[in-house]
Amino acid sequence: MDYVAQSPWIATLIVTATTYCTLRWVQYWRSWVNVPVVGRRGFLGSWISTILWTWEARGCIQKGYEKNKDFAFQVSTPNGWEVCICNDDMIKEYKNLMDDQMSALAVTSETFQAKYTLPGADWDAVHKLVPQPALAKSLMWLRNRAANDTDPYFPDFVRAFQRAFKEEIQVEQDGPFEWQSFPCFPRYSRVVAALTVKALLGSLANRPELIDLLCEYAEVIPLDGFFIALFPAILKPIVAFFCKAPRLSDRLVKVITEEIARRELENKHRIPEDMTDWMAQWVKDNPGYSIESAVVRVIATFFGGIHTTTQLTVHTLLEIATRPEYVDPLRQEITTALKAHGGWTKSAIESMTKLDSFIKEAQRFNPLDAASLARQATRDFQFSNGLKLPRGTWVFAPNGPMLFDESLYPAGSQFDGLRFWKLAEQTQRPHDYRLVTASSKYLQFGDGRHTCPGRFMAADEIRLIVAHTLFHFDIAIKNHGPRPRNTTFKKICFPDMSAEIMLRPRKLHGSEGN
């Protein structure tokens, strides 16, 4: 003991370890819920499960669903005990609750440490942000513009895409007619970024340095958020000071705020042309909110869109590249749509129902998140069946396992690119099976109060990118190899970020379209 007293580093280590174990013990009991446990039990066992959560998360959720699909189960994670709600009635009960009971933003905020990395998703500052309904209205405004044949929005959107595709993919559609390989994810992510910036920030999409900045920011947020979360609250501001995300966020806020000011000086009565214009006008009409509160919301929307949209785009391209039997029917549909609707119009994209089905099946077969409808109980909550959740509990629904449940999706372990097209034909309810349709059995875009409002814009981007690629090019995996395996991190499934595909320009006849 004298040695310990004379060695401050050892004393500090003992105090730190004791404090950590105490906090872990408190967290263990405070977040405990009276439902079955999947994984290791007990204080030590749950601690081991927490460490292994990074690798075992998706397997734990699958196992829990198979054993408890009519009720619920809990798993030990770095956030404490998280509860997976499998019962339909219980899911319906919590998914539409207000944020003062079950908050989706609180989960996002904690996951990405938004206070430091993503101010537009900071739960602690939610009262200062432009409200979620206003954000949803701005995205609905963009959706309505895209659907209006007399509005220049969608033709401008297509031109922005064509320019971005040429600059970023760097494979000329007019030849040479040879296979050219390149890394799929980084190239297509920049195309998605350019399209998203076009919708959110308009003319700023023409500034490559802004695309660079936004792409870099989107890459570092998950990394910095994960790193900051490793530290206790008292140390997080210090750790964040040495991370890139806060500095990049400040730079983006400055650039976009200056652009809004420039537009205001140029024309005080400017008619909104993009989401930033719309949000700036909303702030004018609703005193009490700052321009910065709108800007950080726009930036958070960009982050929310670029990763999910790029991942589904890449998954779809990898599936097409390794399933040649779908190329001709999809290509024929694209050609017919372009002829019938006069080129790359919104109506043409909407009429590509087989392509829509293929993309949705690629999403089902490669679910981004094994969980969906993630919420944090912002106060103690009790389900109608008596199950109690203490304040702070994280809950989610088993998105991944449901998508492979044979009772919901017959032959779910097999890829069927026309699955949803055939269901639409059989039931005569086409809108029930579109990519953008959310339901209690298909939670990829969420469901209920926080169904993703940006899914319509994302669907336009993905369908346009995939249709253009398939129409103008033959596609294959590099060296005509097999589909690269996905990688997982916690609940998340990613396509192989380093996977390379090959494109070869097609020799199109003049009658085939443009």
Swiss-Prot record:
Signal sequence extent: none
The membrane spanning regions, by residue number, are 3-23
Q: What EC number(s) does this enzyme carry?
A: 1.-.-.-
Gene Ontology cellular-component terms for this entry are: membrane
| Single GO MF annotation | oxidoreductase activity, acting on paired donors, with incorporation or reduction of molecular oxygen
Cite the InterPro entries for this sequence. Cyt_P450, Cyt_P450_CS, Cyt_P450_E_grp-I, Cyt_P450_sf
According to its UniProt entry, the protein's GO biological process terms are: mycotoxin biosynthetic process
Its function, per the record, reads:
Cytochrome P450 monooxygenase; part of the gene cluster that mediates the biosynthesis of the indole diterpenes penitrems. The geranylgeranyl diphosphate (GGPP) synthase ptmG catalyzes the first step in penitrem biosynthesis via conversion of farnesyl pyrophosphate and isopentyl pyrophosphate into geranylgeranyl pyrophosphate (GGPP). Condensation of indole-3-glycerol phosphate with GGPP by the prenyl transferase ptmC then forms 3-geranylgeranylindole (3-GGI).
Protein name, per record: Cytochrome P450 monooxygenase ptmQ
